[in-house]
């Protein structure tokens, strides 16, 4: 996913995101195919419910069945994305929570499986409001395990922008029930890395 998001001084955002989905994610989003733009927009608002949307629209929806590739643009405005504390704005690095439901019962009776491997790259450009300076940036983070890899880094430029680059790879595999707590900890760490 590539996105450009403008944060306003009241904490709202206007974003333009371009999604290009293959593999497991193609299957997860395939239900959008055949819906009207309004229905698909409502479905995405429901999927990405952590944003307080004022408007949301899907455009340029394409399903390339031969290559199993879905692509679409998602334009939105949302309130209360960031919090103002003094002269600082705090916000999530990744606006959309891609983590699907995971059974978080750590005591399992059966082995578990990641049936579909996938890799996902996000590049998000945040335009910071005029009058704000980027005073502090989080440390780059990287997590590696038998279940996959996760990295998140933030860089700034001279245009008062923050550029977030996030990569996640989930490995295909079957694992004994005793490793589920470790897998769950890996996925939870991925989520914790998203707040700036």
Regions found by a protein language model. Give the residues of each.
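A sensor for short, sequence-defined functional sites
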Residues: 1-196
């Amino acid at each position: 996913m590539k996105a450009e998001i403008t944060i306003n001084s009241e904490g709202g955002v206007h974003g333009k995101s371009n999604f290009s989905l293959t593999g497991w994610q193609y299957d997860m989003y395939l239900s959008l195919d055949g819906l009207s733009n309004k229905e698909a927009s409502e479905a995405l608002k429901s999927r990405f419910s952590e944003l307080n949307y004022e408007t949301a629209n899907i455009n340029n929806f394409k399903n390339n069945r031969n290559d199993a590739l879905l692509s679409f643009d998602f334009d939105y405005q949302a309130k209360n994305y960031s919090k103002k504390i003094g002269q600082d704005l705090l916000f999530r690095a990744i606006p959309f929570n891609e983590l699907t439901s995971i059974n978080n019962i750590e005591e399992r009776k059966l082995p578990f499986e990641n049936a579909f491997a996938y890799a996902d790259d996000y590049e998000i450009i945040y335009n910071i409001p005029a009058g704000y300076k980027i005073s502090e940036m989080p440390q780059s983070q990287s997590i590696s395990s038998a279940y996959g890899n996760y990295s998140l880094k933030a860089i700034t430029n001279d245009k008062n922008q923050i550029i977030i680059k996030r990569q996640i790879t989930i490995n295909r595999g079957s694992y004994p029930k005793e490793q589920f707590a470790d897998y769950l900890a890996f996925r939870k760490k991925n989520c914790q890395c998203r707040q700036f």
